[in-house]
Amino acid sequence: MRRIPCFVLVVILILAAAVLPVAAQTLLATVPVQNFNFYLAANPATNMLYVLNTCGTDPNCNTNGTVTVINGVNNTVAATVNVGINPQFLVINPVTNKIYVTNRHDNTVSVINGANNTVIKTIAVGAHPTIEDVDPITNKIYVVNNGNGQGNSISVIDGNSDTATATIGVGNYPVSLAVDPVRNKIYVVNYCGAQFGCSAHFAPGTVSVIDGRNNTVTGTVTVGYGPLIVFVDNVTNKIYVSNSCGATPSCDSDGNTTNIMGTVTQIDGAALTTQTVNTGLGQAAMSLNAVANAVYITNSTDNTLSVINGSTLGVQTVNVGTLPQDVEVNVATNTIFVCNYNANTVSVINGNTLATVATINVGVNPVEAWVNPVVNRIYVSNVGNNTVSVLSGVAPTALQFVPVTPCRLLDTRPPGGSGPISGGTSQTFNLPQLSQTKSCGDLSSAVAYSLNVTVVPTHTLGYLTIWPGGQAQPVVSTMNSTDGRIKANAAIVPGGYQGSVSVFASDTSNVILDINGYFTEPGAQTLQFFKLTPCRIVDTRNNMHGGTLHAGVERDYTIPTNCGVPASAKAYSFNITAIPPSGGLDYLTVWPKGEAQPVVSTLNDNTGTIVANAAIVPAGPNNATAFYPHNNNTDLLIDVDGYFAPAGSGGLQLYTQVPCRVVDTRNSGNGFNGQITVNVQNSACLLPSNAGGYVFNATVVPPAPLLFLTLWPHGTTQPTVSTLNANDGFITSNMAIVPNSDGSINAFSSSQTQMILDISGYFAP
């Protein structure tokens, strides 16, 4: 993910080499940029790529640098932005859509507004700013100043005002840093450690540990010689530092580490103790996969990739191309990409088997890469011919469903729980372990979970996000409770590190996770999804379908076949709406008829408003399902949009997607009232054309009470169903599985509202 910073490299070897054979060609496009395009990064929230051209339009570097902006949807140049002199690095805050560029010779940082690609501010920092990192939670940017005088420091930039608010002194010749947003700590690598000025015989390097709450250095850790790159695994709380000189205190005076065995130091973030492992000759770059708990190091002299197991610190070696430079990993597919500088290729490696599955021809001298896991694209910067190669990623794994009797995995409420998640922080939960503890079944083979997520805010909750443990927090929300109500929302969430999921709460809130099934690789007992045009199967209003349900009394429904649900269905995809005549319902529980009522909730309503929630419900004997309102009478609406059954004609599999925002009407006006069409396939999320159904999280932001919102397939008649309700006028979310036939869907709002659609997966053959 990060190479050795270019200001440290004295010589870039440009040697002729034979191109390796290509096993599978996945080059999609080649985009021209400008001179010395050493670094690039993508904003996963907007699907825009930013390429840093250190020398701008002048190959002799006598002008300002530039940033080339590439539209990731069509792979064309959208803009070229002038920045300062000798720019070194850029970082993106996807939450604010701002890009920060360090200008080494100007001692400044250029701030680019990603909405209009203009420099909105230039911030003075310390001497020779280089590497930087951003904390998207606190909206602070940390800049390494490694020059003399004002150097040997970190500048802290407030992303709200884009002003430098603090300068923190660190060790000698700081070269890189990494932020842990979970613990609000910053780790700074000091190349020369405690020795002022570097020489051929220098002291070991150090890492300065900064507390982001008060900008103070709270610890200093000694690492190896010539440390350059640092990564933080915020799941295991381990920090990894690449030492280019390894255990050798006498690197060549020009910093040449060609024939020196590099090492990696693992720091325990709690105790600040260290362990060190050997890698290979001529370290070039390092990357981290927190989901797989693995660290990757390219070794440019012996043309290998070292793979470190974060648990055991065992090292495996993979042969790659000639003079490997950057290494990147797609944590969503566990695929590794290595830039082979002299071979003009990229090695594609399966992270599970460490087998090279493809070698792809790219441009001349590929030196840097970036993975956008949201759209499964890889971008490669070729400095030999000033281009960017766009590669497609490895296809996601097809998954099928295994229903589970609804079961409570987690409840943070005291006395049995660990207490609420503090506002502005996240926690990671190991669901397979929780499932064993709670007797919810064996989840060891689960790749993704079908959950019902309930929030119990202490006051109000701006938003909550749930995502795979070890992955970066996506710029989406799972649910909101701006009115402070207890709310539930269904979610299909892939498992991350050891099957874990992470949960972020913008404000302090308790969280409840109930499971009703999981998705895994196809097998003898797994089920495919069969889509249906949304259809209403139960409406108890006006004394229909048994009339109003009574508090504390179970009501059973046999799922009829008139909506296309066959007797072979083993689970149903419902949207359930509760309409209590007066007072709060407290909660409603839905489960397979014939089994004991589980201690779970399917939806919550403690104020008496109309509430909808999606639910995947296993089928009971004779296709019967049980419904239980806890504390009040209620009418029910039950809509079905699909079912799960053994494999057959028309059956679809789930393909999980790193959450991606398909549309946010707040960006283009006042929202809508009535019907609109959303072109999902042509959105920035780059979804495939064969998707048979989309898994959305739909959110409305109404200015006043909203009776209902309905989503349905484009090209079909609007069904008599609803997706969600916001009768109280507050922000409301609900999961929705919407069938697809032509890449678009329709949305109907009964009154004016803004709408946000985030996608977390799709069903396809």
Question: PLM features: residue spans?
Answer:
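The N-terminal extracellular segments of secreted preproproteins, especially immediately downstream
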Residues: 5, 54, 60, 191, ...
